Amino acid sequence: MTENTPVPVITVSNLIKQFGRFAALRGVTAEFSGGKLYAILGDNGAGKTTLLRTLAGLNQPSSGHISILGSSKFHDICQQVGYMAHPSLLYDEMSGMENLDYFARLYGITSRERCAEVIRAVGLDPDLVRPVGQYSQGMKQRMSLARALLNNPKILLLDEPFSNVDTHSATEMVRLLARTRDQGKTLFIVTHQASLLEGAADEFVWMESGKIVGRTRELKRPESHGESAGGNLTGGNLK
């Protein structure tokens, strides 16, 4: 690695995740640089969410190696990563502030000002008292993002943040995520609405059958490499 080569924030090597006899990830090897927005694309069953959950420490790899910001320890990874699940993990009967206060305590954060800060950061009002169950889908997604930002992570892993959101709200969410990237965070976004990220994503990462089969700077699906791909693509393999 030369002086001008960016140090990867995430490195995965021969990553395999099996559920019984089914291999959801099949030997993924890749490096990802920091301060970028990566769109993770592919058909249903390609392994996108499994990769995201495994990077977040929610899935134990069957084999292989993950290093996030130089560490492979689960505790260190949890401190550096924010995860936005699909569907969102919010309590409908609680207000947004109550939700964030609850999850903040799980991180050992006792300052309600931190909760208010992340709510404002996603464009919502911390004084909003009605239950989350009465929020629009766009507001719920913003609140889920606020939850992911609570521990001020350097890396955000977002699963379908535009799901069931109207076009205007989705566009506003993209702008918010781009600003978050511009503040120095690294974002990985799984989505089936790739066109929303055209012009915002730094890189499109294409998955197929549990492997990374291509990485492009433009929203153009690479030719399928089939079994020969091996998921072995690093940050330099861009088209």
Regions of interest found by a model, annotated:
Residues L156-D159:
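Catalytic Walker B motif of ABC-type/P-loop ATPase nucleotide-binding domains
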Residues A56:
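Helix-to-loop junction immediately C-terminal to a conserved catalytic motif
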Residues D101, R112-D127:
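Conserved ABC ATPase "signature" region
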Residues G64-I77:
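Conserved ABC transporter NBD signature motif
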Residues L41-D43:
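The feature captures the beta-strand-to-loop junction immediately N-terminal to the Walker
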Residues T191-H192:
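H-loop/switch region of ABC-family ATPase nucleotide-binding domains
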